[in-house]
UniProtKB/Swiss-Prot annotation:
SUPFAM superfamilies: Multidrug efflux transporter AcrB pore domain, PN1, PN2, PC1 and PC2 subdomains, Multidrug efflux transporter AcrB TolC docking domain, DN and DC subdomains, Multidrug efflux transporter AcrB transmembrane domain
Protein name as it appears in the record: Multidrug resistance protein MdtC
Pfam families according to UniProt: ACR_tran
Homology family: Belongs to the resistance-nodulation-cell division (RND) (TC 2.A.6) family. MdtC subfamily.
Main localization category: membrane
Keywords: Cell inner membrane, Cell membrane, Membrane, Transmembrane, Transmembrane helix, Transport
Organism of this sequence: Salmonella enteritidis PT4 (strain P125109)
Molecular function, one GO term: xenobiotic transmembrane transporter activity
Phylogenetic classification of the source organism: Bacteria, Pseudomonadati, Pseudomonadota, Gammaproteobacteria, Enterobacterales
Superkingdom per UniProt: Bacteria
GO cellular component: plasma membrane
Length: 1026
């Protein structure tokens, strides 16, 4: 009593405390960062190594395996995958959440150093690492185009100056430059001219390497001067290399230009980048795992004027893709939804109370509670994101509940003629324990979420803490500010002998009278109500098993990403044509705003595309509907497939796959994996529950297999090393020398001129100089035949791996897809040597599925414990928790009605319902117990009176929560696919719960009261018919 009086009789102090809470919240709001979702990125580091010309199998065995053995010893590695292709290896290390990315990077560098001695010679550089996830979509893509600059020159400018500057911006993890390669001097050899002059390819290579050196020459000095020695030992341009003497034939000099075409070109001619049908250089910017995407993008945009100032006038720099506008639009939608929810909740209060002064009290309590939460969010290191703002939107219905319960009880005393301050004190004292019970039991629901581990735990923690803090502040406000305002703002009135006869009052009286009549009937037919209650429990179980499930709702971020997979024997020229064809099809779609793409590099038959859609308000279709429409058009392109997927704010794993979900096959036997992967992929492709099925195992690349006759080689004076060196020199784009420039280093690349290597007959023109100086044709000691070869070799851990990626057709849930895959694997009879498991998002989904029921049971158990402690009873908490089955049925039925799968967002809704619907029972049970203790009523009379007396606040709190959640259901625009499942779950659960628990709770109360008396061996009074 004294605690409540302290605030009621000291209004100035109470107002200033509320103002302080509000001011702290406003300050916290201004300091909070903005993000699409809570920070849930796994720390990921990518290690890259190259050996130009090496086959995928060579890269896997000689480069990937030594690095993997060394990197696998690092502590905290969650998953290690690698992919080796022509001339390159990439290893992805995914660490545990609690691993510091900088500490992990130091360990990675130490592991690379330890493996250095085991790596093959001839690598142009040491392996490097980057602190970024290559499977993440770029947060921003910049394009460089020019009418006068070559692609190589543009690439050089982009990588040397722009990428270096952008990489220094806070939050940037990686700037990947694509579309071409660095400038280089290319030496295109003429095999016939070399044969005529008797010059070997090794001789050419050694002559070039010896002619271009960079060594210190020292200095000369006397007593007065010092002269630095400088020579023309470096060759920098093609024109300087052409007259280079590489051989003497009968005393005549043979110059490089006599046997080769020497041009200023690029290191790798098999690269192409485009933006909207124009050749372009792409700068694909990815953030650090722990970085905030909005702050990083803002930092890049702030740097753009400086970047444009340093760019020559001939270059056009444009933003081709930016993830931030849709994120900002989504958050703006949530903020508008929050404002609408607050307005609707206050409207509900006004309709019930029909008093401007009375409505002003919760109208003040709600913003104080919500705004004050921002201060706690800032102190906890949270951000303004979709989930935290949705928590505040839902909190509007919660925080007003406490104020409504206190306000309604005080108003009841005022209507009975009590003085305002006395009514405030008496009313608050009566419901103080009820309000505390409701709030603490609601917060208890979220305790299991706070203890939940893994990605789901990280994702839900911010939501749970934000909502819990809002409820806590609301509890304080409702027991301090609300009674004070009631005592000083509301006026007492004479007791009314007749109920109100106008508007909502008349409707409420009619509802209350109807409820009283129906409740009498129910209390006289308890067995029927018991059957209904047991039926809702059984229906819950059936609906939960039957409802389709997924991990996270598919988002429409306005950005699509696509992977091109062409015939494995396709040439680069043909692949570039496929890229152009696909880009034209997509660019012609009316919903597409911009499209960029690139192909080439180590995987000639693949490419990537990034599509920016028009803003949500300018298109009618969702991202998935656009993908479905484009899939039909893209399927008509022969010889290649483009797999599109909508970019998501959550992407798990480091695999770069051509679809949203992955199923990985592992085996210690590469032969077994290559045998079974095509069978499994074919079977999965036939499943209607899957779409866009594809695999990263590509074993049908065209290969020319050379078989050496070692006896003949020995007789001719040729060794295998010389033969292999010939092939590398001729066809491996071999980097044979380095050109040093002030801003960068460039390579001299040697190969047979493409004009002389158009087909397999080029091998017949190759020759080796033997130990006697004679030119021996390759055909003298080698035979060749066509064969199939892998275009890539993949590992997970130290096992051979193949990942089958898939998307979901419209209307199919992830649970249906995973069940179909597991069923197919069983039917195929896959041997134990080949192991299959879901990876990435699908793996997290399965882990979440296994813990969902445990989480729900843990929440119910926690609430039971808290209520048991508060009521000092084993029985009354069960009565209160009996409200849950009807809410579960309503939520699951609503999801089915709206064709929405049960996702992590829907799980949040179920957890919230556990906290919401029990409030009705708490208000009933509290007043029934008080009536039994102080009024001497029987249990039946007490619960009947409690139900009628608390009917108005129950209706108010339920409608407030319902109208607070309703904007989530009705919201459209950006991010609505995240908000709607939460709103559907809560609204469905509240409607069903309100219809049933008003009747089932009294029946359960009486049942447990009889049970309690029976176990205590006391004679219970007979149930009095009402």
């Amino acid at each position: 009593m004294r605690f409540f009086a302290l605030f009621i009789y000291r209004p100035v102090a109470t107002i200033l405390i509320a103002a302080a809470i509000t001011l702290c919240g406003i300050l916290g709001f201004r300091l909070l960062p903005v993000a699409p979702l809570p920070q849930v990125d796994f720390p990921v580091i990518m290690v890259s190594a190259s050996l130009p010309g090496a086959s995928p199998e060579t890269m896997a065995s000689s480069v990937a395996t030594p690095l993997e053995r060394s990197l696998g010893r690092i502590a905290g590695v969650n998953e290690m995958t690698s992919s080796s292709s022509l001339g390159s290896t990439r290893i992805i290390l995914e660490f545990n959440f609690d691993r510091d990315i900088n500490g992990a990077a130091r360990d990675v560098q130490a592991a690379i150093n330890a493996a250095q001695s085991l790596l093959p010679g001839g690598m142009p550089s040491r392996p490097t690492y980057r602190k970024a996830n290559p499977s993440d979509a770029p947060i921003m893509i910049l394009t460089l185009t020019s009418e006068s600059w070559s692609q190589g020159k543009l690439y050089d400018f982009a990588s040397t100056q722009l990428a270096q500057t952008i990489a220094q911006i806070d939050g940037v993890g990686d700037v990947d430059v694509g579309g071409s390669s660095l400038p280089a001097v290319r030496v295109g050899l003429n095999p016939q001219a070399l044969f005529n002059q008797g010059v070997s390819l090794d001789e050419v290579r050694e002559a070039i390497d010896s002619a271009n050196v960079r060594r210190p020459q020292g200095a000369i000095e006397d007593s007065v001067h010092r002269w630095q020695i400088q020579t023309n030992d470096e060759l920098k341009t093609a024109a300087e290399y052409q007259p280079l003497i590489i051989h003497y034939n009968n005393g005549a000099a043979v110059r490089l230009g006599d046997v080769a075409s020497v041009t200023d070109s690029v290191q790798d001619v098999r690269n192409a980048g485009m933006t909207n049908a124009k050749p372009a250089i792409l700068l694909m910017i990815r953030k650090l795992p722990e970085a905030n995407i909005i702050q990083t993008v803002d930092g890049i945009r702030a740097k753009l004027p400086e970047l444009r100032a340093m760019i020559p006038a001939a270059i056009d720099l444009q933003i081709a893709q930016d993830r931030s506008p849709t994120i900002r639009a989504s958050l703006q939608e949530v903020e508008e939804t929050l404002a609408i929810s607050v307005a609707l909740v206050i409207l509900v209060v006004f309709l019930f109370l029909r008093s401007g002064r009375a409505t002003l009290i919760p109208a003040v309590a709600v913003p104080v509670s919500l705004i004050g939460t921002f201060a706690a969010m800032y102190l906890c290191g949270f951000s303004l994101n979709n989930l935290s703002l949705m928590a505040l939107t839902i909190a509007t219905g919660f925080v007003v509940d406490d104020a409504i319960v206190v306000l309604e009880n005080i108003a009841r005393h005022l209507e009975a003629g009590m003085k305002p301050l006395q009514a405030a004190l008496q009313g608050t004292r009566e419901v103080g324990f009820t309000v505390i019970s409701m709030s603490l039991s609601l917060v208890a629901v979220f305790l299991p979420l706070l203890l939940m581990g893994g990605l789901p735990g990280r994702l839900l923690r911010e939501f749970a803490v934000t909502l819990s803090v809002a409820i806590g502040i609301s509890l304080v406000v409702s027991l301090t500010l609300t009674p004070m305002m009631c005592g000083w703002m509301l006026k007492s009135s004479k007791p009314r002998t007749q109920p109100r006869k106008r508007g909502v009052g008349r409707l409420l009286v009619a509802l209350q009278q109807g409820y009283g009549t129906s409740l009498k009937w129910v209390l006289n037919h308890t067995r029927l109500v018991g059957v209904v209650f047991l039926g809702t429990v059984a229906l819950n179980i059936w609906l939960y098993i039957a409802i389709p499930k997924t991990f996270f709702p598919e988002q429409d971020t306005g950005v699509l990403m696509g992977g091109i997979q062409a015939d494995q024997s396709i040439s680069f020229q043909a692949m570039r044509g496929k890229l152009q064809d696909f880009m034209k099809i997509i660019r012609d779609d009316p919903a597409v705003n911009n499209v960029t793409g690139f192909t080439g590099g180590s995987r000639v038959n693949s490419g990537m595309m990034f599509i920016t859609l028009k803003p949500r308000g300018e298109r009618k279709e969702t991202a998935q509907q656009i993908i479905d429409r484009l899939r039909v058009k893209l399927a008509k392109e022969p010889g290649a497939r483009l797999f599109l997927m909508a970019v998501q704010d959550i992407r798990v794993g480091g695999r770069q796959a051509n679809a949203s979900y992955q199923y990985t096959l592992l085996s210690d036997s590469l032969a077994a994996l290559r045998e079974w992967e095509p069978k499994i992929r074919k079977a999965l492709s036939a499943l209607p529950q899957l779409a866009d099925v594809n695999s990263d195992q590509q074993d049908n690349g065209a290969e020319m297999n050379l078989i050496y006759d070692r006896d003949t080689m020995s007789r001719l004076g040729i060794d295998v090393q010389a033969a292999n060196s010939l092939l590398n020199n001729a066809f491996g784009q071999r980097q044979i020398s380095t050109i040093y420039q002030p801003m960068n280093q460039y390579k001299v690349v040697m190969e047979v001129d493409p004009r002389y290597s158009q087909d397999i007959s080029a091998l017949e023109k190759m020759f080796v100089i033997n130990r006697d100086g004679k030119a021996i044709p390759l055909s003298y000691f080698a035979q060749w035949r066509p064969a199939n070869a892998p275009l890539s070799v993949n590992h997970q851990g130290l096992s051979a791996a193949s990942t089958i990626a898939f998307n979901l057709p419209t209307g199919t849930s992830l649970s249906q897809a995973t069940e179909a895959i597991n069923r197919t694997m069983t039917q195929l009879g896959v041997p134990s040597t080949v192991r299959g498991s879901f990876s990435g998002t699908a793996q997290v989904f399965q882990q979440t599925m296994n813990s969902q029921l445990i989480l729900i049971v843990a929440a119910i158990a926690t609430v039971y414990i808290v209520l048991g402690i508060l009521y000092e009873s084993y029985v009354h908490p069960l009565t209160i928790l009996s409200t849950l089955p009807s809410a579960g049925v309503g939520a699951l039925l609503a999801l089915e009605l709206f064709n929405a799968p049960f996702s992590l967002i829907a799980l949040i809704g179920i957890m919230l319902l556990i906290g919401i619907v029990k409030k009705n029972a708490i208000m009933m049970v509290d007043f029934a117990l008080e009536a039994q203790r102080s009024g001497g009523l029987t249990p039946a009379q007490a619960i009947f009176q409690a139900c009628l007396l608390r009917f108005r606040p129950i209706m108010m709190t339920t409608l407030a929560a319902l109208f607070g959640a309703l904007p989530l259901v009705l919201s459209g625009g950006d991010g609505s696919e995240l908000r709607q499942p939460l709103g559907i779950t809560i609204v469905g659960g509240l409607v069903m719960s309100q219809l049933l628990t008003l009747y089932t709770t009294p029946v359960v109360y009486l049942f447990f009261d009889r049970l309690r008396l029976r176990f205590s061996r006391k004679n219970s009074k007979p149930v009095v018919e009402i």
